[in-house]
Amino acid sequence: MMNIKTNPFKAVSFVESAIKKALDNAGYLIAEIKYDGVRGNICVDNTANSYWLSRVSKTIPALEHLNGFDVRWKRLLNDDRCFYKDGFMLDGELMVKGVDFNTGSGLLRTKWTDTKNQEFHEELFVEPIRKKDKVPFKLHTGHLHIKLYAILPLHIVESGEDCDVMTLLMQEHVKNMLPLLQEYFPEIEWQAAESYEVYDMVELQQLYEQKRAEGHEGLIVKDPMCIYKRGKKSGWWKMKPENEADGIIQGLVWGTKGLANEGKVIGFEVLLESGRLVNATNISRALMDEFTETVKEATLSQWGFFSPYGIGDNDACTINPYDGWACQISYMEETPDGSLRHPSFVMFRGTEDNPQEKM
């Protein structure tokens, strides 16, 4: 297994003054669609071994079967049109065709095949497969849709250093690689991220509103002159209704007694990577029911008694089966004192096999 920290360029929150400065310097901005997918880093070394990794350098469970040698990568590396003979990393957004974000990200994080996902498996099963059968889930690559942001020489990735290629040139590098990827891996839908050039802040706002109306999450605004940096750095900015943060589940949030959601799990206490503890709620009724039933089953199995609020002077009796799970929350804004407005639970970030390890 390749021991590498991909640490891709990650956009920071929208900062109008910084964006205006980049606009004044370059004369325009590059605005790309912000896709609802799973950030993926595909590393290919000079021996034609590939590694399909998440943005935190963990193997993506549903794509683990793609790791290792593939003669098609060898042919691509030997193609005269390939500028990266010593290996490269593709940085992009991984999506599953024909399904929404939550379904797609769930499939990519899935470890075991069952009746809910076997139609997406690379093999055709005649009989229903159950999770207890322990059949590894292998996503058929025909279901994969990949939007590419960048391509980096592998030695730069391994060094941990920034890649000294400006955004405006990186787009051309991606366009040069696309025909090779489409030729050697035609079953995968490869595309460059949809991008636009805007020449003032009014035009940027109009584009943002247009893409939101089309159903997209928002935009990634990029400084054309900024090189590809490693990690969460200024030069790429998220333009979307909310910000997000990662954290670890510490507890359950129960609905208020006497109100409609009494007796239901309405969210989680989450310890953010910043060290702040928040109550992340605002989940669907379907998730409330799912989480509540899971907690109830775990508690009854352990104690034979379930009481989310306690009875009389007795404390509540519940077990949190989600304790320690990695997750992502969203929030409207951060106040000057560091607290978050309207934190909401978005999704689990761990894998099915290890929910406590962020993917």
Curated annotation (Swiss-Prot):
Keywords: ATP-binding, DNA damage, DNA recombination, DNA repair, DNA replication, DNA-binding, Ligase, Metal-binding, Nucleotide-binding. Changing K238A: Complete loss of transadenylation activity. GO terms for molecular function: ATP binding; DNA ligase (ATP) activity; double-stranded DNA binding; metal ion binding. The keyword S-adenosyl-L-methionine does not apply. It comes from the Viruses. It catalyses: ATP + (deoxyribonucleotide)n-3'-hydroxyl + 5'-phospho-(deoxyribonucleotide)m = (deoxyribonucleotide)n+m + AMP + diphosphate. SUPFAM superfamilies: DNA ligase/mRNA capping enzyme, catalytic domain (SSF56091), Nucleic acid-binding proteins (SSF50249). Its cofactor is a divalent metal cation. GO terms for biological process: DNA recombination; DNA repair; DNA replication. It is an enzyme of class 6 (ligase). DNA ligase that seals nicks in double-stranded DNA during DNA replication, DNA recombination and DNA repair in an ATP-dependent reaction. Binds specifically to DNA nicks containing a 3'-OH and a 5'-phosphate group. This is DNA ligase.
